[in-house]
Amino acid sequence: KQMKRRIINIASYEKPTFMKRIKGMTAFMLTAVLLLGFAPFISTYAADGSHYQWDSSSENISYVDLSTYFGEYEGSFVLYDLENDAWSIHDMEHATLRVAPNSTYKIYDALFGLEEDIITPENSFIAWNGETYPFEAWNADQTLQSAMNSSVNWYFQAVDEQLGASDVYSYVQEIGYGNENMSGDFSSYWMESSLEISPIEQVELLTKLQNNSFGFAPENINAVKDAICLSSSAAGTFYGK
């Protein structure tokens, strides 16, 4: 809840010239905020894949200073205006720094499971195996909606187990997910392990999800969007993970 409030506060920053542009948007807005409080600051782009080598020469980028909102944390804010093809970025260094996706990866893991009919939009039920987990919400049967809402790790690990490592890796490569490195343990490759992705790559993938540039079944795309919908009104829809 505290993290959610921080994200909302950053996204609603009210510098007039910035908000004037935000209020004029009618297209889908994509935001990705990664707080990297325990990640070391890297002053130059590394050649070892730790940074996304983004060719921004042809991009329309506005740099915003949101350091007041981050406080003692090091991190980034990346917003892409789909209608105007324009970026607003706080801290380019961290915006290209690849880190573990952790629960944000569940968006795509769910999509892979849907594409392979492990789960379907109509039936995404997976039974709890009876193992005791540290969060009460995890100790129950789950659907995609409940598993996404409570960020239930075992649900997505179960999807992976049914998919198999080879199929998961094929999908990771197909959509170009970050460094595409699944060399870590198969049960946790996306949790502080080998798979890493930068905030800018996260936003690029969210744009592809919105436009279904993947060419996946529209009903599967919509099922994932529904599962990560936080609120919706006449003003727009807010998604998050």
Place the predicted regions along the sequence by residue:
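Mid-domain, small-residue-enriched loop/turn segments at the edges of structured enzyme/sensor domains
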Residues: 143-144, 156-210
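Beta-lactamase-like hydrolase cores
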Residues: 46-95
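A glycine-rich, coil/turn loop motif that links secondary-structure elements
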Residues: 97-100, 133-138, 185-197
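Active-site SXXK
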Residues: 99-123, 147, 202
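Short, well-structured active-site flanking segments
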Residues: 115-131, 217-221
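Acidic helix-start/capping segments at beta-turn-to-alpha-helix junctions
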Residues: 124-140, 146-152, 163-164
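Cytosolic-facing loops and C-terminal tails of multi-pass membrane proteins
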Residues: 2-61
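Short, Gly/Ser/Thr-enriched beta-strand-loop segments that form substrate-interacting elements
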Residues: 230-241
